[in-house]
Design a protein with these regions (language model features):
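Bacterial N-terminal signal peptides
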Residues: 10-21
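C-terminal and late-domain segments of enzyme folds
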Residues: 27-76, 86, 90, 98, ...
Length: 339
């Protein structure tokens, strides 16, 4: 074979190789009627040593330092984002802007069948970091509860890899969650009637470390959600789901990163609020304004401030008590301010 013929043969062989590689990696932009999959970086699985952790993010602009913390704990492995709607916009940001990962992958689970798909489940289970994007938490409860996706999320936590969520993704991380099944609810309406249909709560979805007996809420100060969080807590204890319940309210552009010992550190702008119930509410009935006195509140405001979730205590920040009296909130702070 002369040189020219040899070169043509090599080029043809390379063409076949490229074509076969493209076929093998078709799921890189998988598009079915049950899920969509997108990736930046290496689509093949790698295994990296990880460290456990949680990222609880309050919505709006993401907190870069919290994602970098997750990436560090991922060991530079595969960073997987799951959601029920939206786009793959996290992928280029994580892979190119933040860097330090083998891949950034987004799985959009469109239907319950997608939450049982072996490809989807393998991608989640093999993640070195897993993040639940914002959206509508009812989609997550409706599509994922009782499925292999729920089991896969628990598996990632159990193997000691970091797991996080923002906004709706934050809402489903606690033992208890506000599902928004009937739509959202504002504080004044929740306080006015704790048993109205929009106060839709769930107690049997995810079970993550240090979030037992906890319900979370996001966009906290920006959307005035203290009243509804107090109402959620009242319902949880009044309905017998827990003898004592705890709430974590996280403001926008703010995150808590939680290490393997349960120490939560504030990243971003703050503040974050930690609430704890004192017992049963005085009045928590259908079509009757809530009366619930003396909930313990702890506020962290400064980046780097810490709270021990295992002991539910801190040497930093501000402590006060909060009460609902016939649907109206007040506190022991100067002027009675609830935040």
């Amino acid at each position: 074979m002369n040189g020219k013929s040899h070169m043509i043969g090599v080029l043809l062989a390379l063409g076949v190789l490229v074509a076969s590689t493209a076929v093998v990696q078709a799921p890189v932009l998988a598009n079915s009627n049950t899920y969509e999959y997108y990736v930046e970086g290496n689509a093949e699985d790698v295994t990296k040593p990880t460290q456990p952790g949680l990222v609880l993010m309050g919505g709006s602009t993401d907190v870069d330092s919290a994602f970098l913390w997750m990436i560090e704990r991922s060991g530079g492995g595969d960073f997987v984002v799951i959601r029920a709607a939206g786009t793959e916009a996290y992928n280029p940001w994580i892979y190119y802007d933040l860097g330090g990962v083998d891949s950034a992958e987004t799985i959009i689970i469109l239907k319950p069948e997608g939450a049982q798909d072996p490809f989807v489940i393998d991608k989640i289970r093999n993640a070195e970091a897993l993040f639940i994007a914002g959206g509508n938490q009812w989609d997550y409860a409706r599509l994922w509860k009782g499925t292999l996706v729920e089991e896969a999320i628990q598996y990632v936590t159990a193997k000691g890899a970091p797991v996080g969520g923002t906004s709706a993704g934050l809402a489903v991380l606690g033992e208890f969650s506000f599902t928004a099944e009937k739509g959202t609810i504002v504080s004044k309406n929740a306080l006015k009637n704790p048993y109205q249909p929009r106060v839709a709560l769930e107690n049997d979805f995810l079970h993550l470390p240090y979030l037992g007996s906890v319900i979370t809420d996001s966009h906290f100060v920006a959307r005035d959600r203290m009243g509804r969080l107090v109402t959620f807590l009242a319902r949880i204890v009044n309905d017998g789901w827990a003898g004592q319940a705890r709430g974590i309210g996280i403001n926008e552009r703010t995150a808590l990163v939680v290490d393997g010992a349960g120490i939560a550190t504030l990243h971003g702008e703050g503040p974050v609020y930690f609430l704890q119930t004192p017992g049963l509410p005085e009045v928590c009935e259908k079509s009757t304004p809530l009366t619930y006195r003396d909930l313990a509140v702890y506020r962290l405001s400064e980046p780097g401030a810490q709270f021990d979730l295992a002991e539910w205590s801190s040497d930093e920040g501000t402590a006060y008590t909060l009460s609902a009296e016939e649907g109206v909130l007040s506190s022991t702070q100067a002027g009675g301010g609830i935040y």
